[in-house]
Amino acid sequence: MHTPGMTAGLLAVLLAGVLHAAEPLRVEVSRDAWISAYPTEQEGNNGGASKLKLKGNQEFFLIDFDATKFRGKRVVRASLHVKLEAAIPLGRTTVSTIAQEWVEGKGSSYAKEPGATSFRWARNGDQRWNGDGKDITAMTLGLGGSIWGFGDPTPPDANRWQVIPIDPAVVQARLDGRSYGFFVMDDVGSEYQRDGDKFTYTLFPNRYVASKDSNRKSSPYFTLWLEDGPAAPAPQVKADAYQAPKAPVTLPAVPKLPSAETSVTATDALGLPIPGLRLFAAKGEAVTMLLSSPPAKVTIDLPHRRYDLPKVGAHVDPLKASPNGRLLEFQIPKDAKPGEHRGMLRLDGQDVPFFVHVWNFTLPDQLSFIAQMNGYGLHDTSRDWFRLAHEHRLTLNILPYGWTGRVSAAPKLRPDGSFDWKQWDDRFGPMLDGSAFADLPRGPVPTEALYLPLNENWPMNHEQHFKGGYWIEDAYDPAYWQTFRTAADGFAKHFAERGWKETMFEFYLNNKVYFKDGQNGKPGNWKACSAPWIFDEPMHTQDFWAIRRFGLEFWQAVAPYKDVRIAYRMDISRPEWQRDLLDGVSNVDVVAGVLRDYPARVIGRNRRDGKLTYMYGGPSKLGQPLVINVAWCAETWALGADGVVPWQTIGDKDSLTKPDELAVLYPGPDGPLPSLRLKAFRAGQQLAEYLTIYSQASGQDRDAVGAAVLALPGLRAGTIKTYDDDAGSSAFGDGAARSVAELRLRLGAWLDAQAPAPRARWHDPRPTRQDPSHLRPIVALPAPTTR
């Protein structure tokens, strides 16, 4: 319920106080329909079913009454009465307005009834939902001019009836003609039972209630408390922040390349053939040439290095530096002479010419697009790993805690609760002031992002403070939040004192309550994970609500340190269900491949709030085309996002002998090793820089350039997932490889002709800090009184 400055207790008192001024009025249901977001049921209609179903973010119902006779009345209280038709009762429940007309239908068993309402259609086959047209979430839960509230129903009575409280503003909108009924959703979703440390998880329990098509005695109904007189001013509704589609620009033509014949075959970082052994590169860029056999000698007036490609099973991927390697890498100096540089390869006793054409523009040292190599559980946090990523224009970020919240890289906690920073500063300080990277191609640019060790179980002891329940406002004692705020303040204050103002310091909650659940027939264990909610990839309203509370506490704690780049990061795989709960709360949103389904919604909302947006997923698999990683970067830039995050990129001790689909950085005997896939991500980041420089130098709108990129053959990808929470991998269409290769040539040749002056940074993707003190408080309605 959006009620500024109001607590749940005060709200209950005020609601009770209006009863003397308005008598309860029973209002019958005029129409209802149960719909489903489950993938195979999204066009199904159950408007004629005898039951209505609630099931987390999978199944919901629409319900309505005839509001015409109540026009001009003021709503002071409202509730919905439902009779349970299943053993599991309702928990906290949302009631939202619906901002578009809908059709009840007569379907059952998820019938695809033409003209009836479903999750995907306002009228099946005839009318999509408005907004971005994706589904009903575009017209409910705060979008499309809708408003919502949630609250706790009464416990079931002796006859299995429950009463759901409704925000009076939600009903008022119906009376005033600003709504077409009510969307009802289960906010609890999955449940668990705990007996000591024994843990049992129940995924998406079914919650059934009788519909109006059951019988008169079981039919749901509303109770309204109405008064004469003008209604209170309608709540201010935040305008939808959809990113409007732009007409694609005309990209520069593909340049005509010099014809050259050679019997030597070679491929570039995209895994594509290099015609005439002629490479093209900007100043400050790195390019590669992979030969079928190692040359005896390489000569050229540009810095270069060589790598061997040891096999892992049937695949090649990890790279070992070698003076006799067959992968050649050329790092173009920023002061390199523009134009053609001729080199010579000694192959089979013959001298074979090759060429590196240096374009007359320079890649910036500070990144416009961040390809973040994510990692977990790496105990060796030596600087070599971070240097390897930095050298490749990539950002390594390693989460410093595991499922139980135990930290592996945090300042020592003194008995008085303060931190001893000595060892932590020695380890990470050079990466935060940039000195660790001073001798690398980008120079002393600090690492772009660093996870903080803060989590639900550090430095707080979760079990000492957790009181249970699904709703975070009642789950912890005040001491828990005080300890958390003190710690967050301590980090921000220390960073401010050290002058570390470039790196994004990310507070991120990664754990999930269902990690406690048993696997492979083993019983669940409460101690297996410290999270009582799904923090990473939140699923249910209870999860988003908990994440919101942590964010409010975090921003309150770090508010005094304005110059430190503080971030509240979260991984989002269900942006359609986050409502406005994260608006003004998170500022780094790492969004799954579902970004491809909701780009206008996600990008528009995040740009409005100054957020950084990544797309996360998996890297290309061993044996797949390297161009996938490059195309992923180009596509993500074109969608309007600021970077990509392959969710796991660090191999283990066996990755050099057993194929590892996720290893992009390999542990070697003498330190970390790069890979072909790592260099493909670098090529993708560099292409994103081309796109950024082109849009700025040409004066073209970024989104119009993005539309042109997405219109190229094969560059609108799909996401392949093997299970619901799979990060997924990108599947590009036919022609993607050629489109990416030609895109690079189009932009490079155009920029070469324009010769824009170098800049340290062409675009700053880093987010603005959030200030939730300006947000309207959201308060859950208490359970209705018995009257």
What would you call each of these model-derived segments?
Residues 68-72, 169-173, 331-338:
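Short, surface-exposed loop/turn segments at beta-strand-coil junctions that are enriched for proline
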Residues 87-172:
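Beta-strand-rich interaction/scaffold domains
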Residues 165-236:
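Proprotein-processing/basic-patch segments
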Residues 241-275, 286, 294-328:
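Surface-exposed binding patches on compact interaction domains or structured appendages
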Residues 306-308, 330-334, 342-561, 569-583, ...:
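Aromatic-lined carbohydrate-binding surfaces of glycoside hydrolases
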Residues 586-656:
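Catalytic-core region of carbohydrate-active enzymes that cleave or remodel glycosidic bonds
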